[in-house]
């Protein structure tokens, strides 16, 4: 499961992700990708499930890049505990995602394989996504 090796503080305030993604909103490594269309927290387990779905469908061909990392700690109090008495214990980590953020990129496979692999990955995520292709990618003359 994805999580930071070390954090400065064990707990963090919830905060609110507002607006669209200002960085990480364009394809940087691959020719294909999935872009978030809504704001949500994505856990490390969800990212890992999406990664496994992509690699299984692509049969270890090509290359993928995970563009988000869960570095925000989430706390939870046990069941049947009254309000107060401090913040709960750290439970896991999430990656806050805003609209426009590229989540996964792929390269080295055909357009059809990449589209289906990233569709399977998008089903594992709790947000609506959009399949994006690099502007200078030529679908007619693909050599994958």
From Swiss-Prot:
Any GO molecular function: tRNA binding
Keywords assigned? Ribonucleoprotein, Ribosomal protein, RNA-binding, rRNA-binding, tRNA-binding
GO CC annotation, single: cytosolic large ribosomal subunit
Q: Where are the transmembrane segments?
A: none
SUBUNIT field: Part of the 50S ribosomal subunit.
Task: Write down the HAMAP family for this protein, in alphabetical order.
Answer: Ribosomal_uL16
Q: Which family does it belong to?
A: Belongs to the universal ribosomal protein uL16 family.
The entry's function note states:
Binds 23S rRNA and is also seen to make contacts with the A and possibly P site tRNAs.
Instruction: Name it.
Output: Large ribosomal subunit protein uL16
């Amino acid at each position: 499961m994805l999580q930071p090796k070390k954090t400065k503080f064990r707990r963090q305030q919830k905060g609110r992700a507002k607006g669209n993604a200002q960085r990480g909103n364009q394809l940087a490594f691959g020719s294909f990708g999935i872009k978030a269309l809504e704001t949500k927290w994505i856990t490390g387990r969800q990212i890992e499930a999406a990664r496994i779905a992509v690699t299984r469908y692509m049969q270890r061909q090509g290359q993928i890049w995970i563009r988000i990392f869960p570095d925000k700690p989430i706390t939870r109090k046990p069941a049947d505990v009254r309000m107060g008495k401090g913040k709960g214990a750290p439970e896991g980590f999430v990656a806050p995602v805003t609209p426009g953020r590229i989540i996964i990129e792929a390269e080295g496979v055909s357009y059809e394989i990449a589209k289906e692999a990233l569709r399977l990955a998008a089903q594992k995520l709790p947000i609506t996504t959009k399949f994006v292709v690099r502007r200078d990618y030529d679908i007619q003359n693909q050599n994958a």
